[in-house]
Curated annotation (Swiss-Prot):
Quaternary structure (record): Homohexameric ring arranged as a trimer of dimers.
The keyword RNA-binding is annotated on this UniProt entry: yes
Protein name: Ribonuclease PH
Entries under Pfam families matching the protein: RNase_PH, RNase_PH_C
PANTHER family the UniProt entry points to: EXOSOME COMPLEX COMPONENT (PTHR11953), EXOSOME COMPLEX COMPONENT RRP41 (PTHR11953:SF0)
PROSITE patterns membership: RIBONUCLEASE_PH
Length: 237
């Protein structure tokens, strides 16, 4: 039995509120259970120096957590004077995951920065950031298309992510914090709407796992990502 009472293949309730902020070209507040992340997308008519003049666009991301997103206060990284290793790892993951669904030629020589700010954390913040970040990106690109700034849609496939793991010996979908902290195996699965893999992060936390168990987690992830993509499409319809 899961602490939440959910079935093994049951996701937490998902809601996506678009247009949550008025200034960003795209914004979405995604809630997956008690994990809440605000995602905004900003369009800039510039690109990093390493692709300047190439005609290619760029999508990048930044990630952070509010001090009381967790049960005890965390010091702001800006106060500490540097980003932690976890933050850097996660924002790089978000950026490369989102880029996997983008035609950078069609985007043109501009950059879109997706900011993901965790308001409340209860497990799966990086997955929620990727899923909500795609919605913010979709909304920002819609504005480019409406203005005629791009000829064709540069977003070729939705991108979403979900955590799956082995808890109490059972494969489970969408781990919350109590499950994540006790999981024997923990994994993050990033996929496209067409069920193509972008990245899989899996590690044995308390016990090793078999190929069969990995396949079970992959099946759960595919189901979960399908549900998340449906929520993305409903939010941006």
């Amino acid at each position: 039995m899961r602490p939440s009472g959910r079935e093994l293949n049951e996701m937490r309730p998902v809601s996506i509120e678009t247009g949550f902020t008025k200034h960003a070209e795209g914004s979405a507040l995604i809630k997956i259970g008690d994990t809440h992340v605000l995602c905004t997308a900003t369009i800039e008519d510039r690109v990093p120096p390493f692709i300047k003049g190439s005609g290619l666009g760029w999508v990048t991301a930044e990630y952070g957590m509010l001090p009381r997103a967790t049960n005890t206060r965390m010091r702001r990284e800006s106060t500490a004077g540097k980003q932690g290793g976890r933050t850097v790892e996660i924002q790089r993951l978000i950026g490369r995951s989102l880029r996997a669904g983008v035609d950078r030629v069609a985007l043109g020589e501009r950059q879109i920065t997706v900011d993901c700010d965790v308001l409340q954390a209860d497990g799966g913040t990086r997955c929620a950031s990727i899923t909500g970040g795609w919605v913010a990106l979709r909304l920002a690109v819609n504005k480019l298309m409406k203005a005629g700034d791009v000829i064709s849609d540069p977003l070729v496939d939705p991108v979403a992510a979900i955590s799956c793991g082995i808890y109490a010996g059972q494969p489970v979908m969408d781990l919350d914090y109590p499950e994540d902290s006790e999981a024997g195996v923990d994994g993050n699965f990033i996929m496209t709407g067409s069920k193509q893999l972008i990245e899989v992060q899996m590690s044995a936390e308390g016990a090793t796992f078999s190929r069969d168990q990995m396949n079970q987690l992959m099946d759960l992830a595919e189901k979960g990502v399908g549900e998340l993509v449906a929520a993305q499409k409903a939010a941006t319809a």
